[in-house]
Amino acid sequence: MQLNPSEISDLIKSRIQNLQLAATSRNEGTVVSVTDGITRIHGLTDVMQGEMLEFPGNTFGLALNLERDSVGAVVLGEYEHITEGDTVKATGRILEVPVGPELIGRVVNALGQPIDGKGPINAKLTDKIEKVAPGVIARQSVSQPVQTGLKSVDSMVPIGRGQRELIIGDRQTGKTAVAVDAIINQKGQNMFCVYVAIGQKASTIANVVRKLEENGAMEYTIVVAATASESAAMQYLSAYAGCTMGEYFRDRGQDALIVYDDLTKQAWAYRQVSLLLRRPPGREAYPGDVFYLHSRLLERAARVNADYVEKFTNGEVKGKTGSLTALPVIETQAGDVSAFVPTNVISITDGQIFLETDLFNAGIRPAINAGISVSRVGGAAQTKVVKKLSGGIRTDLAQYRELAAFAQFASDLDDATRKQLERGRRVTELMKQPQYAPLSVAEMAITLYAVNNGYFDDVEVARVLAFESGLQQFVKAKAPELVAKITDTKELDADGEKTLVAAIAEFKKSWA
């Protein structure tokens, strides 16, 4: 085929006319100083707060301090190769992380990059890590339960979908154990889980992931890990990244549970970043906005109404509410709940589960202090059967603790007091539960009914847990239809009660 010169010139002209050249104008600055992962940059005049900055060597940073003649930024990742005089580009984008079902079963870092060696994550969507919490009109009251499978939690401090329930206690009191048990118990409950590990040892996180895998919980769980060896900036951002991943499910009419383990270390990381950015320190050297640090994170956990979900999904999902339930963890120093960060988070959340060192060391695990642990909104969401049967448990325990303190000094006790002490000892023993062994609603109902009606009163304290285990196995074998009915309806009617009483009486005869 031969082309004449005029055709060639026409072809070239048409190619030139159709050439798509997208010219982008990006602001550039110069690195003035680099210290401990914090850079000062001169010349970025129109950068936004929280904007991503591009450093040489495919490294990114986050603009946090906007000053008159310079910008203070944290480097996300390695910063050893960055030197004074390097060019920094503004990207015009706020920090985003991948979201969606593709992340389920994976372990990622604070930027959503996989760190579990299972290959890349092909997520179709990304979302901003900093988002405004749903407004008052978009919310719906908490009315559906989150079953943790722990007798002491579900009976005394129930948690509802969309609630923020703080887990607080000293180190080594079983805070992570309560949170991990709650995740394991969500199997088959249509609940997606996000576990955010902040500032923990890599070996500890690996152990949690292994336990979740062994119990089949990684099938619905995302793990976001910012280990102790990572930069303070990554530890500070990881909680927001995890929250964004959880919000993906909430906004599409599904339910999600997020555990922040723990927010004390996140506050420490933020304090470190703030001091390096030369922000003025306040109480305990924290910056002035440390309350806002946690409030803007925890307010994003909410139950949103069907209108919000329908609007968000452009009518694809109708008649469904979505929820994000948060279980933040706070570590106290020598039981001091009046320190700065614990009081802040207590005031933000809808209740707290307080774990005590003394109870833990006495072998009462989970070591929940019934007196000062509360759930402000969970009562409305509690399963009907558990709510009906657990009314006396909290009172029994609280009165027992008070009487036990007096009984140490009193030599002669009247029968009523002695009976109350005996009941209290058995209830305390009954609230013990091994790790990774959550109970179903039916199993919990059997136990609570038996203790409320005095069936444990003549059982030796040392044999209470054996009696409970035997009773549950017996009822499940003798009355499987009752167990199935309680599981389905979450209620115990008069007929069910008769069947249960007969089964317990029969078991007590055979118990020796």
Swiss-Prot record:
ATP binds at G169, D170, R171, Q172, T173, G174, K175, T176. This is ATP synthase subunit alpha. Belongs to the ATPase alpha/beta chains family. The keyword Phosphoprotein does not apply. Keywords: ATP synthesis, ATP-binding, Cell inner membrane, Cell membrane, CF(1), Hydrogen ion transport, Ion transport, Membrane, Nucleotide-binding, Translocase, Transport. The record marks S373 as: Required for activity. It comes from Azoarcus sp. (strain BH72). It is a peripheral membrane protein. It is found in: Cell inner membrane. InterPro entries: ATP_synth_asu-like_sf, ATP_synth_asu_C, ATP_synth_asu_C_sf, ATP_synth_F1_a_nt-bd_dom, ATP_synth_F1_asu, ATPase_a/bsu_AS, ATPase_F1/V1/A1_a/bsu_N, ATPase_F1/V1/A1_a/bsu_N_sf. F-type ATPases have 2 components, CF(1) - the catalytic core - and CF(0) - the membrane proton channel. CF(1) has five subunits: alpha(3), beta(3), gamma(1), delta(1), epsilon(1). CF(0) has three main subunits: a(1), b(2) and c(9-12). The alpha and beta chains form an alternating ring which encloses part of the gamma chain. CF(1) is attached to CF(0) by a central stalk formed by the gamma and epsilon chains, while a peripheral stalk is formed by the delta and b chains. Its EC number is 7.1.2.2. GO terms for molecular function: ADP binding; ATP binding; proton-transporting ATP synthase activity, rotational mechanism. Produces ATP from ADP in the presence of a proton gradient across the membrane. The alpha chain is a regulatory subunit. The keyword Transit peptide does not apply. Gene3D superfamilies: 2.40.30.20, ATP synthase alpha/beta chain, C-terminal domain (1.20.150.20), P-loop containing nucleotide triphosphate hydrolases (3.40.50.300). Its main location: membrane. One of its GO terms (cellular component) is proton-transporting ATP synthase complex. Signal peptide: none annotated. It catalyses: ATP + H2O + 4 H(+)(in) = ADP + phosphate + 5 H(+)(out). Disulfide bonds: none annotated.
